[in-house]
Amino acid sequence: MAKKIQAIVKLQVSAGMANPSPPVGPALGQQGVNIMEFCKAFNAKTEPLEKGLPIPVVITVYADRSFTFETKTVPAAVLLLKAAGVKSGSPKPNTNKIGKVTKTQVREIAETKQADMTGTSIDANIQSILGTARSMGLEVEE
């Protein structure tokens, strides 16, 4: 018999830096989960990744207060900013361009994100990443 699911908690936690402070502590504490157990497991799983990158995580909490979690890939916006070498997006993306990314970089990001994206093909995912880049004020070079 499958365990009864009590809650599904979605968070963004920095890779290798999970600790009981907000947002992790309050979100899991409300569900009665052992917070330190999650932090240790999450930090161990994200150890190979670059420290500090925001990692979306989906935590399934069961009625017996046990849990499982699944990490997703880094958000596309973060990968685009990193590729362009800038800190944040443009407040006016239509008029102020803040940086440039190449089609090759966009393709690499789309391939990295392939598992988490809803597009059926790599080309559809590339178009999605291009839209994200445009909305952030990034120019895409050939």
Curated annotation (Swiss-Prot):
Modifications after synthesis and translation: One or more lysine residues are methylated.
Organism whose genome encodes this protein: Hamiltonella defensa subsp. Acyrthosiphon pisum (strain 5AT)
Protein family (similarity comment): Belongs to the universal ribosomal protein uL11 family.
Keywords assigned by UniProt, alphabetized: Methylation, Ribonucleoprotein, Ribosomal protein, RNA-binding, rRNA-binding
Entry protein name: Large ribosomal subunit protein uL11
GO biological process, one term: translation
Keyword hit for Nucleotide-binding: no
Quaternary structure and partners: Part of the ribosomal stalk of the 50S ribosomal subunit. Interacts with L10 and the large rRNA to form the base of the stalk. L10 forms an elongated spine to which L12 dimers bind in a sequential fashion forming a multimeric L10(L12)X complex.
Cellular component GO terms, alphabetical: cytosolic large ribosomal subunit
GO molecular function terms noted in the UniProt entry: large ribosomal subunit rRNA binding; structural constituent of ribosome
Stored CDD domains: Ribosomal_L11
One Pfam family linked to the record: Ribosomal_L11
InterPro entries on file: Ribosomal_uL11, Ribosomal_uL11_bac-typ, Ribosomal_uL11_C, Ribosomal_uL11_C_sf, Ribosomal_uL11_N, Ribosomal_uL11_N_sf
Signal peptide as annotated in the record: none
Function: Forms part of the ribosomal stalk which helps the ribosome interact with GTP-bound translation factors.
